[in-house]
Amino acid sequence: MYKNWHDIEFPVHLPDHVDHTKVLWEPTQTKKKQAELDTLFDDKGDLKILIMNVEAFSTSKGLDFAHRFLNIFLGKALIGIDESTTIKNPTAKRTKNILTIGNLASYRRILTGSPVTKSPLDLYSQCEFLDPYHLGHESYYSFRARYANMMKRNFGGRQVQLVTSYRRLDELADKLEKFSYRVLKEDCLDLPPKVFTTRTVEMTPEQQEKYYTMKRAAVAEHDGKIMSSATALTTLLRLHQITCGTFKADDDTLIHLKNNRLTALMDCLEETEGKVIIWATYREDIKKIVESLKKAYGEASTVEYHGGVDATLRQDHIAQFQDVKGPTRYFVG
């Protein structure tokens, strides 16, 4: 995600007239990368931008370099943390390191699409990074005591406190409003309303046979290959794999079943104009979809995005898809 700032966000949003040096941090450093990092310390007088992943602050190498960089610009530096829920845990090593190093920057900002993931208590470390006085609490525990109802429980001979519910959330919301800015999707994007359409795809006879056998007996057989499941959850997974047309036998053999899903997808795409994002659950499905699209619409028509694609290549694929004048129309992930 952090490479997105280097490849897309800064090039799009930083004005062309601003002279700058922009360097992407990488944990494994070659001589070329070291020389690139050294340009952040020259005296050209331009804007210096260091882009690091949050995980780097869990390492001494990343923390030391960030410390060195910020010490050069005391009183002038800004630190921004994207996806700031990555520092929501006040006891995590990287959170503690970032809170400490944040004191070297005169300006601090956070960005997130979901400041509260599980609990309002997630807000404490994020807000403390901005300014310890924003919430009016000097410690996480006083903050928790103010906004959470706690209960003591004994586990294995030791006593722990558990959150049972939350309180004074209106008060907390009022405090947040004073130093936060919320932008809704409809405020910044001109998008049509979502339209949901369900398309029913019939299973082939081969799929139906495997599906109902697995459903009844938690076992399915294909050309002598057995697929079984030991739990209800595994059975549900196997049933889903069968409906998708591909499953793994117990000996890890990949079994392909005739299915109508790909034909239904291609029919749907013939009715669609503009760019299309296609999500699939399994890598094998992605592979089949990409092959079919490239065969029908050309090699440059489709890019894929998943963990099996190199991180640098993934960013290139995003850029290709976002290029309104480019040939890439389908994004499969």
PLM segments and residue spans:
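Conserved Walker A/P-loop ATP-binding site and its immediately adjacent core
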Residues: 1-10, 117-122, 281-283
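Conserved helix-turn-beta segment of the N-terminal RecA-like "Helicase ATP-binding" lobe
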Residues: 2-30, 130-134, 296-299
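Conserved helicase motor
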Residues: 22-34, 54-59, 88-91, 280-284, ...
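Conserved helicase ATPase core of P-loop NTP-dependent helicases/translocases
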Residues: 33, 277-279, 287-288, 297-333
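Inter-lobe coupling linker of SF2 helicases/translocases
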Residues: 38, 51-57, 67-73, 92-106, ...
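Conserved two-lobed SF2 helicase motor
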Residues: 44-61, 323-333
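Walker B catalytic acidic pair
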Residues: 82-83
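Conserved helicase ATPase motor motifs in RecA-like P-loop NTPase domains
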Residues: 106-120
